[in-house]
């Protein structure tokens, strides 16, 4: 099936729903609304909004699904649920950082390791201040009430790095008076242990959430151990009927060992990583207006031993880095007249990074040649406005513009425009055009011999057409996109230059259908064509899941297929195809105790996601959940 065929199918479906009939009366629309599922999201709109009125494609993963996965990391659940989204892996547990690491998030041929995917926590950006990539080991399941994933550029609202999409982690907080406590303990293959404890409390105006987690594993290859500690705390206070405040902090520390690839082993390589996040916000909610002012920071301290290739030798220095992303964000969303919504906001970010080396023997800072060390301060300030207007009962238009000024690259204009048409039978037809961009990183500007202080931002335009129908019985969606961009940063003659181009197009499909009261089928598929392929982007990804629920039992069988996943590009292009079969089951013994078990790669498939890093064959985990 080619793109023209799918466009024809979408157009025919839309027409058959009678969306063009202006005679639709209020009673018909009310009936449609009662049959559809009204989903409220915050990603892509700043303030909360009904996804049926937004021209964006947002997937929401709720707390119940996060808990049912029994994963300590959020990312495996996100990969299963979002069409086309990929996260690289090299072992059973632990992504790591630096050379040989995994955790690279990709979507539509745009990748997080290049700063083209943005992760948010409560709407605040999270990335390394030197390399601008997400730190995938930081995103633990115990912090999340839900996760919202926006496919396609979101730079109009969130600025740099939101080229390929956004993953927004909304942190947990109790909404009703009372208290909840949970404890999870699990163990499995290769000495893997995962534990976490969470306590939540709310009394009148006050609410608190606190959690702590620990995990470790030997993994399936020698010298590939991983150990992690983490936790989060959140305090909320309702100042009045219209005003509330919250303070949120989380931290993680992990140690990761690195054996190198199977063809080029490395000895003695190890990483010690500490990451932290803190934010404070003041929120207002009135009948026709909502808004928020927040301050935030994310920071990290990295110490890395790169190891040596000779097993009889040892390295004599550590690579160290410090980075911080600190900012202020404010927005107000208001209804100016009937069926309208105007959102205006300002963002300020201060981005800091320092990279240097120290002696193992003395601890002193070493002088390095070839720009191996450096320090950078960059500032970014932006203002944006987004207007959403219902022209008719069944049609909404949306247009926005961001003006962003970066202290190095200057001023960038980022427009976005879209339209939604709603059918009488709970259908939504969406058209969207949006610009995405990212500013060059500290590494690209100042570190290592290829660095170039005259770099400009990367820029893309994304065009997409989608059809979705959400009812209480059957939900499905089809999305077509086309991406074209230039100014992509590449190394030419040993220097970073804005010369690369990108031209990608593809189709994304997802569907969920309850076969009866006990059995639900879910599936998603994506096809991607890239003029210039990139690592970690599969040409096809498909997920098929059966979820069975009966009494105290829950069983889920999931098959995930990857076709032509690029592990190397260029002259030595390499790609692989494989299918993974996973099975999980849980038994709720009583109101307090749940027992569960999970098996992954049950077919013992031999495959690689990172070139030279074979993944483990079949693995298993089992555990208990105690809820009070």
Name each region found by the language model.
Residues 21-67, 75:
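Short, acidic, small-residue-rich periplasmic hinge/interaction motif at the N-terminus
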Residues 76-124:
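Extracytoplasmic beta-strand/coil segments of soluble accessory domains associated
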Residues 124-151:
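Short acidic/polar hinge/loop motifs at secondary-structure boundaries
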Residues 166, 171-201, 212, 217-224:
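Short strand-turn segments of transmembrane beta-barrel domains in outer membranes
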Residues 205-209, 242-247, 287-292, 301, ...:
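Repeated loop/turn-to-beta-strand initiation elements of outer-membrane beta-barrel proteins
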Residues 217-224, 228, 242-325:
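Flexible loop and strand-edge segments within Gram-negative outer membrane beta-barrel domains
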Residues 262-285, 321, 376-378, 426-428, ...:
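Outer-membrane beta-barrel signature, preferentially recognizing the C-terminal barrel domain
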Residues 390-393, 481-484, 498-568, 591-598, ...:
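Gram-negative outer-membrane beta-barrel transporters
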């Amino acid at each position: 099936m080619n793109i023209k065929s799918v466009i024809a199918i979408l157009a025919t479906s839309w027409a058959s729903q009678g969306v063009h009939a202006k005679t639709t009366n209020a009673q018909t629309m009310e009936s449609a609304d009662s049959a559809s599922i009204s989903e409220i999201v915050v990603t892509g709109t700043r303030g909360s909004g009904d996804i049926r009125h937004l021209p964006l494609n947002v997937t929401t993963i709720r707390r119940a699904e996060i808990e049912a996965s029994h994963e300590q990391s959020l990312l495996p659940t996100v990969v299963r649920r979002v069409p086309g989204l990929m996260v690289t892996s090299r072992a059973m547990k632990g992504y790591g950082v630096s050379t040989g690491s995994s955790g690279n998030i990709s979507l539509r041929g745009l990748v997080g390791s290049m700063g083209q995917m943005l992760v948010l926590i409560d709407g605040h950006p999270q990335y390394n201040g030197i390399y601008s990539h997400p730190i995938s080991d930081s995103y633990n399941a115990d912090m999340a009430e839900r996760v919202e994933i926006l496919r396609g550029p979101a730079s109009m609202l969130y600025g740099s790095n939101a080229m390929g999409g956004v993953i927004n982690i909304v942190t947990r907080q109790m909404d009703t008076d009372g208290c909840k406590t949970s404890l999870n303990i699990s163990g499995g293959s290769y000495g893997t242990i995962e534990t976490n404890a969470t306590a939540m409390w709310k009394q009148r105006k006050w609410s608190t959430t606190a959690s702590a987690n620990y995990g470790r594993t030997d993994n399936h290859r020698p010298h590939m151990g991983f150990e992690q500690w983490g936790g989060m705390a959140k305090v909320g206070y309702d100042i009045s009927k219209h005003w509330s405040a919250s303070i949120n902090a989380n931290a993680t520390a992990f140690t990761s060992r690195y054996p190198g690839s199977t063809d080029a082993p490395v000895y003695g390589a190890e990483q010690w990583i500490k990451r932290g996040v803190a934010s404070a916000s003041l929120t207002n909610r009135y009948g026709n207006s909502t808004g928020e002012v927040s301050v935030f920071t994310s920071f990290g301290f990295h110490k890395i031993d790169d190891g040596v290739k000779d097993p009889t030798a040892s390295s004599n220095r550590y690579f160290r880095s410090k980075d911080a992303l600190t900012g202020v964000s404010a927005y107000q969303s208001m209804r100016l007249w009937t069926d309208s919504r105007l959102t205006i906001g300002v963002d300020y970010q201060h981005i800091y990074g320092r990279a240097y080396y120290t002696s193992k023997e003395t601890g002193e800072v070493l002088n390095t040649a070839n720009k191996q060390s450096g320090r950078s301060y960059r500032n970014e300030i932006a203002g944006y406005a987004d207007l959403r207007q219902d022209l008719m009962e069944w049609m909404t238009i949306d247009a926005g513009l961001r003006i962003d000024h970066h202290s190095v690259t200057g001023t960038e204009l980022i427009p976005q425009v879209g339209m939604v048409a709603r059918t009488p039978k709970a259908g939504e037809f969406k058209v969207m055009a949006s610009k995405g961009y990212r500013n060059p990183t500290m590494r690209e500007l100042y570190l290592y011999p290829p660095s170039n202080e005259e770099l400009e931002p990367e820029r893309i335009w994304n065009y997409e057409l989608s059809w979705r129908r959400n009812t209480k019985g059957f939900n499905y969606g089809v999305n077509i996109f086309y991406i074209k961009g230039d100014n992509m940063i590449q190394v030419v003659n040993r220097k970073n230059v804005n010369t690369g181009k990108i031209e990608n197009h593809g189709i994304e499909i997802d569907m969920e259908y309850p076969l009866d009261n006990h059995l639900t089928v879910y599936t998603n598929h994506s096809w991607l064509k890239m003029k210039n392929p990139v690592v970690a982007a599969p040409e096809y990804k498909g997920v098929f899941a059966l979820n069975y629920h009966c009494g105290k039992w829950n069983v889920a069988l999931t098959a995930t297929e990857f076709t032509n996943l690029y592990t190397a590009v260029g002259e030595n292009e390499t790609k692989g195809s494989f299918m993974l079969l996973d099975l999980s089951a849980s038994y709720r013994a009583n109101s307090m105790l749940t027992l569960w078990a999970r098996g992954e790669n049950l077919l013992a498939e031999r495959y690689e996601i990172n070139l030279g890093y074979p993944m483990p064959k079949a693995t298993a985990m089992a555990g208990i959940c105690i809820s009070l």
